[in-house]
UniProtKB/Swiss-Prot annotation:
Known EC number: 2.3.1.-
Function comment: Xylan acetyltransferase required for 2-O- and 3-O-monoacetylation of xylosyl residues in xylan. Catalyzes the 2-O-acetylation of xylan, followed by nonenzymatic acetyl migration to the O-3 position, resulting in products that are monoacetylated at both O-2 and O-3 positions.
Residues glycosylated per entry: 271, 283, 422, 455
Transmembrane regions listed in the UniProt entry: 23-45
Region (Disordered): 50-164
Record topological domains on the Cytoplasmic side: 1-22
Alphabetically ordered keywords of this record: Disulfide bond, Glycoprotein, Golgi apparatus, Membrane, Signal-anchor, Transferase, Transmembrane, Transmembrane helix
Keyword Ribonucleoprotein applies: no
Source organism of the structure: Oryza sativa subsp. japonica (Rice)
The name this protein goes by in its record: Xylan O-acetyltransferase 5
Keyword Membrane: yes
Location in or out of the cell: Golgi apparatus membrane
């Protein structure tokens, strides 16, 4: 997603001299001081930025275009490292010789006390020391728009339409500690959150992980307006499809909008693989469909899927896809369930229930590509681009390998309370960048149906502080005191606390939806077949 670049970085300078005059002033100053160094244009621009004259990027500015004292840290990296991380699970075993971490069950979690953060940098110089961790954003929250139409106009100006020139990549930026504007909702105010993600209720002692806001370089994300989004979703269906990270994001989206509906006008129904949150007043639904590999697999049971030997049918998608047809907004993901082994087991005829199950093995990246090709063919054939919008979420990183952010003696993400914001080296948290690249290439190659690739990976790698760690469930029960005392085995560094990081992912989705032109009228949900 690109939005118009914010002019002048931290805000316009009233009566500021022209660029030529500014450059001349720098040369004049150098001559007066007797400096006989020939500056090239890049050095001059850097000097101007350091002295606050003009400038395009905001270095350390808060949201909305400025704010001295805002803590801002950057990460724009899209490097490629292929260490393997634990797959969706509870027990982490010692890595096999291939360097792949193997994992078994399906859930564990954790907590976080302090430490000095580590900054990931984005190609800019990392010599400067970030501001004190206690600095906070001093700006006041932006005023609420007086109407949905005003908010829509503002969002259109930022995200949609013709950018008229230079635009801004919203996935390149920094995390800003913004106690005034974050979080977007309170954990205690959203009754639809599951115990898996309610970290504060489950015993986490700090809440700083809720107060970081993503600030793109040189532009701003539109402020989340639940009422505006629900107007866009009136008579429509929005569905997350994939694994438990997409379920994590679905819960976030439900909490972001649910306060706009009275209690008696909203409901949540769980029916096997499909969870449906309905807002009667808007005749809209926000849904989650469990399909961890998108295609058929032996892990498709939404409740009993703690399977070590995962087997897939890479060309069989129709059974799941029958539930996606006609949905107005589709948000797909698949990643963490691929990370158990370096090879995937492919069903060789027959069915998963027939014993013994016969299968072939395929290298993981090749199998992932085969599955995404099956998925993309279904999308191209069955999705009407005039009616529906498709998103694909990039890799949600795990934080199992603390040496990757400079703490070899730490235990995974346990006791992390701050993002990796001061780390001057490349983060190495075990992300499989080959799978990332495969998903990116497949989605970009699609012709008939455009797919929005939501690039959450690099910005999420910084957030080692935001996982559920030991403050979560294990096999449907909260961790015991004894289990919490054993974070090496029980800390969940896969899933995320809510409120938290997935709210930012949904802000990207929100930006696309509210800035897109209104789709043609569709048949109200009440007249569509009920799922």
């Amino acid at each position: 997603m690109r939005i118009p670049r914010r002019k002048g970085g931290a805000g316009p300078l009233v009566g500021a001299p022209s660029r030529r005059a500014q450059v001349a002033a720098v040369f004049a100053l150098a001559l007066l001081l007797g400096v006989s160094v020939l500056y090239d244009s890049a050095h001059i621009a850097a000097s101007l930025r350091r002295h606050g004259v003009g400038g395009g990027g905001s270095s350390g500015g808060g949201g909305g275009g400025g704010g001295d004292g805002a803590r801002a840290y950057t990460n724009t990296k899209l490097s490629a490292t292929t260490e393997e991380a634990e797959a969706e699970a509870a027990e982490v075993r010692s890595p096999p010789a291939q360097g792949v971490e193997s994992a078994v069950e399906a859930t564990d979690r954790g907590e976080a006390p302090p430490e000095q953060p580590v900054a990931a940098d984005s190609g800019a110089s990392s010599a400067e020391t970030p501001p004190s961790l206690l600095e906070q954003v001093t700006e006041t929250p932006p005023p609420s728009p007086s109407s949905s139409s005003a908010a829509a106009a503002a969002a259109e100006a930022q995200v949609g339409g013709d950018h008229g020139g230079e635009s801004c990549d919203v996935y390149k930026g920094r995390w800003v500690y913004d106690e005034a504007n974050a979080p977007l909702y309170k954990e205690s105010a959203c009754e639809f959150l599951t115990e898996q993600v309610t970290c504060m209720r489950n015993g986490r002692r700090d809440d700083d992980y809720q107060k970081w806001r993503w600030q793109p370089d040189g532009c701003d994300l539109p402020r989340f307006d639940a009422k505006l989004l629900l107007e866009k979703l009136r008579n429509k269906r929005l569905m997350f499809v994939g694994d438990s990270l997409n379920r994590n994001q679905w819960e976030s989206m439900v909490c972001l909008v649910q306060s706009e509906a009275p209690w008696e006008k909203k409901s949540l129904v769980k029916n096997d693989s499909l969870n449906v949150f309905r807002l009667e007043e808007y005749n809209a639904t926000i849904e989650f469909y469990w399909s961890p590999f998108l295609v058929e697999s032996n892990s498709d049971d939404p409740n009993m899927h703690s399977i070590v030997d995962r087997i897939i049918k890479p060309t069989s998608i129709a059974k799941h896809a029958a539930n996606w047809e006609g949905v107005d907004y589709l948000i797909f993901n698949t990643y963490i369930w691929w990370m158990n082994t370096p090879e995937m087991k492919i069903l060789h005829g027959g069915s998963f229930s027939k014993k013994p199950v016969k299968y072939d093995e395929m290298e993981r990246v090749a199998a992932y590509r085969k599955v995404l090709k099956t998925w993309s063919r279904w999308v191209e054939k069955h999705v009407d681009p005039k009616r529906s919008t498709v998103f694909f979420m990039s890799v949600s990183p795990v934080h199992m390998q603390s040496e990757g952010w400079g703490k070899p003696d730490a235990i995974k993400c346990f006791s992390e309370t701050q993002p990796a914001i001061n780390y001057t080296k490349k983060l190495e948290v075990g992300t499989d960048w080959d799978l990332f690249s495969t998903a990116h290439h497949v989605t970009k190659a699609m012709k008939r149906v455009p797919v929005h690739f939501i690039n959450i990976t690099a910005l999420s790698e910084i957030r080692k502080d935001a996982h559920t760690s030991v403050n979560t469930l294990r096999q449907g029960k909260l961790l015991t005191k004894e289990q919490k005392a054993n974070p090496r085995k029980f800390a969940d560094c896969i899933h995320w606390c809510l409120p938290g990081l997935p709210d930012t992912w949904n802000e990207f989705i929100y930006g696309h939806i509210v800035s897109s032109p209104q789709r043609r009228p569709v048949e109200p949900i009440e007249n569509q077949p009920q799922r």
